[in-house]
From Swiss-Prot:
Disulfide bonds: none annotated. The lineage of its organism: Eukaryota, Metazoa, Chordata, Craniata, Vertebrata. PANTHER family: LAMIN TAIL DOMAIN-CONTAINING PROTEIN 1 (PTHR47012:SF1). Residues 169-287 form the LTD domain. Belongs to the intermediate filament family. This is Lamin tail domain-containing protein 1.
Amino acid sequence: MMKEASEPLASVTSINKQDSKVQDGEIRKEKIGTITPSKQHSSVHFFPKIMDSDSTTLIPLSRSFSQEMPIGFYQITSTQNSSTLSSRGQLASKSTILSCSHKDSSLGKQSTSSMVPRRQPQSSSDVDTYTFGNGEDYFLSLFGESKKLTAHTPQAENVSEHLSVILEEVGQFTSSSLGEIKIAEVNIKGLFVRLVNSSNEKEVEIGNHILQQNVNGHAVSLYQFPDNITLQANSTVTVWAAASEAKPQPPTDFVWEEQSKFRSSPDCTTILCKPNGEAIAWYTPIHWKQAWEKLETDIEFERCSVVVPSMRNHMFGWITASVSSTNEEKEEPIQKTPSQVYPVLYREKEIPPTVLPNKSPWCRNPNTSPHPYSSLIDSHDSDISESSLDTQLKPQPTKPKPDPGTKKKKAKS
């Protein structure tokens, strides 16, 4: 008995040793064969043996854990004839099968066949899946096409065309004059102011005329032309500032040595006045900022003009609509009073049907004919009863009582 018990224990120990060697070989091969972007640590935990009372089965369990899910579950089942080691791994990995026999006690004679699962390195497509969604390509995939589509839209072209038209219109409307002389240009850098005679045949005298710049209605600089200066037809005259370092060439070019630069800000208005102070030409510069502001206002105006027809119905039409609705409400009762009042009057005149309790046959006298039991009663009795009932129901007129003296007289006669 002792020998028989020692033999299965020796076989179990040999199986455990072989299992540990196989697992060590698997771990080494996994360390050599695994090529992953991040390290994954695995540990093998051994659980105590479980004795089966019925078949004397020894089940040593071992389980390997990784970062995400268990790689394998090993179970050894030993019986009297044979013992099998099976492993259940991941779905993608192949199962490892190791078979041993109790008849051969030596480890050399035992036949083992095992297939160790190896982790294959990730392909380039898998690596791309990790990096997809980051970087410039992802941004361009989201917004690149939209930029291409919106780069040359008709709306942008319309805006640019509208801006150029605004600049042209603003240039015409900001430079105004009462006569032939106009202020054609005020240099943005403030180096000069140019006047032009728009007449094709007429010469204009500008001697002693005053060129001034006003800010908020107050003159900040004044320049007076010399005497006897005549501006030829379709000709220009330029007044240079000292910062321009230009040379005076009358009657076409003049230098204002006391003024380093002209003002070119939008809040400054350049005015040409007669010697008596009467303004004959004025100019207000325009910049990109003002142009964009005007463009925005024009766009808003266009939007409002598009919405105005419907907005008028809502903003202005609601007053008339409310007035008309109130009028209709006032008129409707007047028009509909006949149709609404008459049914009410008819309903008041209608008398609802009422059930009188005295009409019920059960509520009448049983001697009367309509009563259900009237046939059981003698007709003679019924006639008597009816006559007596009628006499009882008929009101008897009250006769005045005669005087006793009158009765006696009648009796004697």
